[in-house]
Amino acid sequence: MTFSGNRALTVVAVAVAAVVLAACGKKEAPVADVQVIKIGHVGPVSGAIAHLGKDNENGARMAIEELNAAGLKIGDKAVKFELLAEDDAADPKQGTAAAQKLVDAKVNGVIGHLNSGTTIPASQIYNDAGIPQISPSATNPKYTRQGYAGVFRMVADDVHLGGTLGKYAVETLKAKTVAVIDDRTAYGQGVADEFEKGVTAAGGKVVGREFTNDK
C-alpha cells in the first residue's frame, strides 16, 4: 500500500504526539537546553517495493524538517527531532534486525514497517522495549490485536476495508452475485477474503474467485 508525502507528515505528527505527549511554544533556547528526540523509520528501501519505502522515508524526512523548523518546546526545553532510518527489504528477518537496531539506538518512537509481514514480528521487539510504533500501511488485523498498548496504525485493517466494501457492493450497489479477483499477495488476498465475507454476510453470493499477478 502506497503512502503519500502528506500522509507521511500526518504520521510523523501523530508519532511525535504519542512520544512526547505535549508540544508548544516556538522560542529559541540555548544548545544545552535542547532535547533530542529520536524517531525511527523502517521500510523497504531495497528490493521489489523499494520505491514505496523510499517515498515513505522521504516523507518522514520532510516532516521532521518541518517540525524542527517550527521550534517546538516540551515544557521549558526546545526539542530537536532526529530521524534514524533502517531498511527491512520487506523481509521479516531483516525487519526484526532493523527493529533491534533502533531499540539499541534508544529511539523514542518508530514509524514502520510498511508490510504486515515485517510489522507484526517487529512489534514484539518494540513492545518489549516500551517503544511506541505506528505503521502507515500494515493492514493485517493481527497487528493491533496482540494486546500491545503501544502499537498503532494509520489505515483500516483488512476486516474493516474488505468487509465494508463487500457490504457496500451488496447493499448500495445492489450486486446479487459477485466474482472476486486478487493478486495473491498477502495484502491482496487478505482484503479479498474479507470482501467475500462481507458479501456473504450482506446476503450476496460469491460465484467465483480468480487470481492474477503483476506479470
Which sequence ranges carry the predicted segments?
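Extracellular/periplasmic Venus flytrap/periplasmic-binding protein
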Residues: 97, 140-142, 149-215
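Residues that mark the start of a beta-strand
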Residues: 36-38, 82, 176-177
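C-terminal motif of bacterial Sec signal peptides marking the signal peptidase cleavage site
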Residues: 19-23
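Extracytoplasmic "Venus flytrap"
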Residues: 37-61, 86-92, 114-117, 181-189
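Bacterial N-terminal signal peptides that target proteins for export
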Residues: 1-12
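Signal peptide-proximal N-terminal region
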Residues: 58-82, 200-205
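Aromatic/hydrophobic pocket-lining residues that form π-stacking "cages" and hydrophobic walls in ligand
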Residues: 60, 122, 195
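Beta-alpha junction/loop-to-helix N-cap segments that form part of ligand/metal-binding clefts
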Residues: 26-31, 51-55, 73-145, 212-215
